[in-house]
Amino acid sequence: MNIIDRFEQENISKLIENKKIPDFKAGDTVKVTVKIVDRSVEKDGKEKLTERFQAYEGVVIAKRNRGITSSFLVRKISHGEGVERRFMTYSPVVHAIDVVKYGVVRRAKLYYLRERSGKSARIKERHMHIAKKPKAKVAEAV
């Protein structure tokens, strides 16, 4: 491992120490919570900063794994128009990433969804089977 890779790994570990990044891929529906800082000037001339969180939910159509510059592209339909937004995976602006549902696709990049709408743009859902815990045996009274 060279110096640059080590430096990137240290920075990534610092950036994700207080947030969990789930394992997701193209075709999955994610909900990304982004921190937005609004600046407003009050009447007396003072600048006021307000923070709020905004959720963006859509289908991941591309994921780019490149160390600290990793990113993913999320597409959603808003008021009949397709909207795409690229998020940097390790950015401090990204507050949380939640996987809403897992999709079944056979491609790594789903750019073909840009030309599709309605039923043809649907993605099958992958059902995650979670192993059930075995029931504890209850001792019978004799």
Curated annotation (Swiss-Prot):
Keyword Ribosomal protein: yes
Biological-process GO terms, alphabetical: translation
Any one Gene Ontology cellular component term annotated for this protein: cytosolic large ribosomal subunit
Keywords noted in UniProt: Ribonucleoprotein, Ribosomal protein
Disulfide topology: none
UniProt xrefs under InterPro entries: Ribosomal_bL19, Ribosomal_bL19_CS, Ribosomal_bL19_sf, Translation_prot_SH3-like_sf
Domain of life of the native organism: Bacteria
GO molecular function: structural constituent of ribosome
Entry's family note: Belongs to the bacterial ribosomal protein bL19 family.
Task of the protein: This protein is located at the 30S-50S ribosomal subunit interface and may play a role in the structure and function of the aminoacyl-tRNA binding site.
HAMAP family registered for this protein in UniProt: Ribosomal_bL19
Designated name of the protein: Large ribosomal subunit protein bL19
Gene name per UniProt: rplS
